């Protein structure tokens, strides 16, 4: 049927309606015609019926559209919701950002305010200091003017007043002096301190123009009356003397001077002006007393009669000018301007108590002055040697600057002395009297006299143990600083005793040239050159014992000439009285000295007992004890044995001078790298007994030439010199001014950055000593004198680059030692392992293109976000050195931190395979312990145990025939570094190590460590083929790796046994026919 449209709007496909079309309606009866209207009524109802019952085609057309519209509406709603949420988040972020910005700005303002307050406080302190200095200077000026006025009044006095005749005041003073002399001497024996008030020295000297030439009214020798160091009050001043203006006094004084110059006994020289100079009679103050020593100047040392007489008669008796605020040796200047030495050998490893002060003019009686000063210095040295905790140098060096510098450097010297006083002078002065003549026996003094400019006996090994009482010496001292001083003191004291016996037997023996030891640097030889310029025979003309004092003191005596008969009988009587009184005084003070020595030894014994150490002095002879008789030869005979060689064991090197490298602020809490680090390690090694099993060697300062093997000349000169010897350098060699290289730290000190502090006096010496100690130890191990070694040194060095100090480091000790091994010993292969938690950027820079030095560093890297930022795994070297720079750089932060498992795995899979393939001749270790548990995040953050480092050390000992040297680098937690050092030294000694915990053996390395190791193996496997074998075992635990290696070893063994078993079976059938061939 066709689907035609109809007027009623129905389509032809509507079959029910199609039956009622009009043509058919016309043939129907009329009675039914009414039904024609039915379609009109039925049609409206039929349409919904069709939709409901038959066809539903219109619905699929309308529903997708609606759903699409609904989906679009929902999408729009979601987008609007997301937009709203995004706007809310942005608004919240902006709000928080603004809040943080405000907080940060407030913190900045607060920080700036604090800095301003600190700056203002510092400025106020400076102003206050300047005000005090100005006030002090004004007081000095007033005192000086007052003295000049007094002097001018005396010069301009009327002719009618008395001039040459002693006044009533003078007579009263003389009488008071005689009555109080004995009381003053006894008082001076019991009081051993110096007044810090400079006016204390000026009390009774304003009348010096009236008290210069009268003979003394007491019979006490002037050479002993006035100690160089001791209690010095107004009553102890030189006796007031009459001026030498009358002819009879002039004649008498000149006669006395002539006799005194030729008199045999120095005890009779009371009035010998040129012999006893102002320096000798002046007390050694540590405060300022700057003045000239012209006759009548008052505040300077009281001049004796001969000086004034010589000046008045046209003979210039120049007296040395003494600058303000100078230390001990500045007062002990001889006639050439050089400084008198202490009798010990010149060791660069002990602190210097003085910097020397040049004299302004020659003194007319220099030889006798030197003689008395030489007797004074041993007395000081032997008294000081009993004081614990006092860091004293065994020598007073004389430099070219001191001889030729004149007064131009005096302000610099004063500045150096001011910097030195808080640590050196205070313990030195307290309780130590120093007399113009020695208080000990001749045998104890004479070695010091002759030792000053004689060479040391050849053939002594500096690191050798003492021939006698070495163990007793170690038990005697519990404080390591004082113990080291006593050990060195004992070695040199024995040698001096041996040497002085030869000198005594040959008093007129000509001088011999100074022999330098290998440890002495060229700088030290230059410092001692001044002492060599004057012949020894000029200083020691003859030796003769003084009757009655042979067992007390030995002094230089001049030949007796016939002119001695010109002396008046009265002088002889006075001399005898003075000699008897002098002898009595000597005995009293010798007894006092012995009592003090016994008191010190008892203190040591008590400290040893408190520490639980055995106390056994037995036959040990105290180092500072004098021989009781010149004829005693038992002690010198014992040191004639040849020095023993060092034991072939682990070597240790340490020096207390490195303790002086510390910030001037004095607060160690704000400076992680402080002196307590190495002091604690040394104490731990001593407490555990490890130090006694090792061989302790003597360190030295590295020379400037040695430093320049790694560092630039400007860097070496800037950080390897102190202000005193820096003045001798060419200013053009120093790049820029010194002040531009340092900054003021928040603590008030000075440094090159916030971490690397600088002490103008001690830092250069400590840094050079650290390098020299490492060099000495490395060379002794490399040459086979020692088995291995551990250097307890500071400051560290592996961050120091060619021209840049950083990270607490100034000179790269390990790199310098490696360079010198190549240059001096032609060592072809050197392995440097750096297990400090920070990358050794300085060491890497020094050998980045050297194929003969393999540098392996294990450090925290964190993609360059941990100090110093270098040490990426792809930094493999350059040029010929490609592949010889291995950075085992751990990345991943502290989630979780690296521990024993990770480091042991790195050693097993990276370090040891490469090291074995390299096959080094010497192994050097930059042994930083800041990866040990206990260090804060900025300084490490890892959780290694101390015993782990013992196992790492033990593995390295399998290389290079055991020639392994560890040098301390970082590590700032005292407990951690002490434990780790103990573990390493124990491993070096070959002791059985404590087993690792089972957890460490079973645990696998964390994912970050595995990824870091795989990356290193991937980079370096093309340079080191042995890494490929361990690439698959990085994820194994130690137990699993050991099991795998055992299985491989068993497999190899089985294969080898199979190959060995087949060969005999094949040979026997071959052999048997050959034996049977002849019968056939």
UniProtKB/Swiss-Prot annotation:
Enzymatic class: hydrolase
Residue segments, region Histone deacetylase: 651-1080
Biased composition (Polar residues): 205-224, 625-637
Any one Gene Ontology cellular component term annotated for this protein: histone deacetylase complex
UniProt keyword terms in alphabetical order: Chromatin regulator, Hydrolase, Metal-binding, Nucleus, Repressor, Transcription, Transcription regulation, Zinc
Ranges of Basic and acidic residues composition bias in the record: 132-162, 233-244, 258-273, 509-527
Cell location: Nucleus
Main localization, broad class: nucleus
UniProt motif PxLPxI/L: location: 348-353
UniProt biased composition (Low complexity): 289-312
Ligand binding (Zn(2+)): 663, 665, 671, 747
Gene3D superfamilies in the record: 6.10.250.1550, Histone deacetylase domain (3.40.800.20)
Gene Ontology terms, MF aspect: DNA-binding transcription factor binding; histone deacetylase activity; histone deacetylase activity, hydrolytic mechanism; metal ion binding
Reactions catalysed, as given in the entry: N(6)-acetyl-L-lysyl-[histone] + H2O = L-lysyl-[histone] + acetate
Residue ranges, compositional bias (Acidic residues): 560-571
Name of the molecule in the record: Histone deacetylase 4
Species of the source: Gallus gallus
Annotated gene: HDAC4
């Amino acid at each position: 049927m066709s689907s035609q449209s109809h007027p009623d709007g129905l389509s032809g496909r509507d079959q029910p309606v199609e039956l009622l079309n009009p043509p058919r309606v016309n043939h129907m009866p009329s009675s039914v015609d009414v039904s024609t209207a039915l379609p009109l009524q039925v049609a409206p109802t039929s349409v919904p019926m069709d939709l409901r019952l038959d066809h539903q085609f219109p619905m699929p057309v309308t529903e997708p559209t609606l759903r699409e519209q609904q989906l679009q509406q929902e999408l729009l709603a979601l987008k609007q919701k997301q937009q709203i949420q995004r706007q809310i988040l942005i608004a919240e972020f902006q709000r928080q950002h603004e809040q943080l910005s405000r907080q940060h700005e407030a913190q900045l303002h607060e920080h700036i305010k604090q800095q301003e307050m600190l700056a203002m406080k510092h400025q106020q302190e400076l102003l206050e200091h300047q005000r005090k200095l100005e006030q002090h200077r004004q007081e000095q000026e007033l005192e000086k003017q007052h003295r000049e006025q007094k002097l001018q009044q005396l010069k301009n006095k009327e002719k009618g007043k008395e001039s040459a005749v002693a006044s009533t005041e003078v007579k009263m003073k003389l009488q008071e002096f005689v009555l109080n002399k004995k009381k003053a001497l006894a008082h001076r024996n019991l009081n051993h301190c110096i007044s810090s008030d400079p006016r204390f020295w000026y009390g009774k000297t304003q009348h010096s123009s009236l008290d210069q030439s009268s003979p003394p009214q007491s019979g006490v020798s002037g050479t002993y009356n006035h100690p160089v160091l001791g209690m010095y009050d107004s009553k102890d001043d030189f006796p007031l003397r009459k001026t030498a203006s009358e002819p009879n006094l002039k004649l008498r004084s000149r006669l006395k001077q002539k006799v005194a110059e030729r008199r045999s006994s120095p005890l009779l020289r009371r009035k010998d002006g040129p012999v006893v100079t102002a320096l000798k009679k002046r007390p050694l103050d540590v405060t300022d007393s700057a003045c000239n020593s012209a006759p009548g100047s008052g505040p300077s040392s009281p001049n004796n009669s001969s000086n004034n007489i010589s000046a008045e008669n046209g003979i210039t008796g120049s007296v040395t000018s003494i600058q303000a605020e100078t230390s001990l040796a500045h007062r002990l200047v001889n006639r050439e301007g050089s400084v008198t030495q202490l009798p010990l050998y010149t060791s660069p490893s002990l602190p210097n108590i003085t910097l020397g002060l040049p004299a302004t003019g020659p003194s007319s009686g220099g030889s006798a002055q030197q003689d008395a000063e030489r007797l004074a210095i041993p007395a000081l040295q032997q008294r000081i040697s009993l004081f614990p905790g006092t860091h004293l140098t065994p020598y007073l060096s004389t430099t070219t600057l001191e001889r030729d510098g004149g007064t131009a450097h005096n302000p610099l010297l004063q500045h150096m002395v001011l910097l030195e006083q808080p640590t050196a002078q205070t313990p030195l002065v307290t309780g130590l009297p120093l007399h113009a003549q020695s208080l000990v026996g001749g045998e104890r003094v004479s070695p010091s006299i002759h030792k000053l400019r004689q060479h040391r006996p050849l053939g002594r090994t500096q690191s050798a143990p003492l021939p006698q009482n070495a163990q007793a010496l170690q038990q005697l001292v519990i404080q390591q600083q004082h113990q080291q001083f006593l050990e060195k003191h004992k070695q040199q004291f024995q040698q001096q005793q041996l040497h002085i016996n030869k000198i005594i037997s040959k008093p007129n023996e000509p001088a011999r040239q100074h022999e330098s030891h290998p440890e002495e640097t060229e700088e030290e030889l230059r410092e001692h050159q001044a002492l060599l310029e004057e012949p020894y025979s000029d200083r020691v003309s003859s030796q003769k014992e003084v009757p009655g004092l042979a067992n007390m003191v030995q002094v230089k005596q001049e030949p007796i000439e016939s002119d001695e008969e010109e002396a008046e009988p009265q002088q002889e009587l006075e001399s005898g009285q003075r000699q008897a009184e002098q002898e009595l005084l000597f005995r009293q003070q010798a007894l006092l000295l012995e009592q003090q020595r016994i008191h010190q030894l008892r203190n040591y014994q008590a400290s040893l007992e408190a520490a639980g150490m055995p106390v056994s002095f037995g036959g040990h002879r105290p180092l500072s004890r004098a021989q009781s008789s010149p004829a005693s030869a038992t002690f010198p005979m014992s040191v004639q044995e040849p020095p023993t060689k060092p034991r072939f064991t682990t070597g240790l090197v340490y020096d207390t001078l490195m303790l002086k490298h510390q910030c001037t602020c004095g607060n160690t809490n704000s400076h992680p790298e402080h002196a307590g680090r190495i002091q604690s390690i040394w104490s731990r090694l001593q407490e555990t007994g490890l130090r006694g099993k090792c061989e302790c060697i003597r360190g030295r300062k590295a020379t400037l030439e040695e430093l320049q093997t790694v560092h630039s000349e400007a860097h070496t000169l800037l950080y390897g010199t102190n202000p005193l010897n820096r003045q001798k350098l060419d200013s053009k060699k120093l790049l820029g001014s010194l002040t531009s290289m340092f900054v003021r730290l928040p603590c008030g000190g000075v440094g090159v950055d916030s971490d690397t502090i600088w002490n103008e006096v001690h830092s250069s010496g400590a840094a050079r000593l650290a390098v020299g100690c490492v060099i000495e130890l490395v060379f002794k191990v490399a040459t086979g004198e020692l088995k291995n070694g551990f250097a307890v040194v500071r400051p560290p060095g592996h961050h120091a680059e060619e021209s840049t100090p950083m990270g607490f480091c100034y000179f790269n000790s390990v790199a310098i030692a490696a360079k010198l091994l190549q240059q001096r010993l032609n060592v072809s292969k050197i392995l440097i392992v750096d297990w400090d938690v920070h990358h050794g950027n300085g060491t890497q820079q020094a050998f980045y293109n050297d194929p003969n030095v393999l540098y392996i560093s294990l450090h925290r890297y964190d993609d360059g976000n941990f100090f110093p930022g270098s040490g990426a795994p792809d930094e493999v070297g350059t040029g010929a050195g490609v592949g010889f720079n291995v950075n085992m750089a751990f990345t991943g932060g502290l989630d979780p931190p690296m521990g024993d498992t990770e480091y042991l795995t790195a050693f097993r899979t990276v370090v040891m395979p490469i090291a074995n393939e390299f096959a080094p001749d010497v192994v050097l270790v930059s042994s930083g312990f800041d990866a040990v548990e206990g260090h804060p995040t900025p300084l490490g953050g890892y959780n290694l145990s101390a015993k782990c480092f013992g196992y790492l050390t033990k593995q390295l000992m399998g290389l290079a025939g055991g020639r392994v040297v560890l040098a301390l680098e970082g590590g700032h937690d005292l407990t951690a570094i002490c434990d780790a050092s103990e573990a390493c030294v124990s491993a070096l000694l070959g002791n059985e190590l404590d087993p690792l915990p089972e957890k460490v053996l079973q645990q696998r390395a964390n994912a970050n460590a595995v990824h870091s190791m795989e990356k290193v193996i991937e980079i370096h496997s093309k340079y080191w083929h042995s890494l490929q074998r361990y690439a698959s075992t990085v994820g194994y635990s130690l137990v699993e790796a050991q099991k795998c290696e055992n299985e491989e070893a068993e497999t190899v063994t089985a294969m080898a046994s199979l190959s060995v078993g087949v060969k005999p079976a094949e040979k026997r059938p071959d052999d048997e026919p050959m034996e049977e061939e002849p019968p056939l």
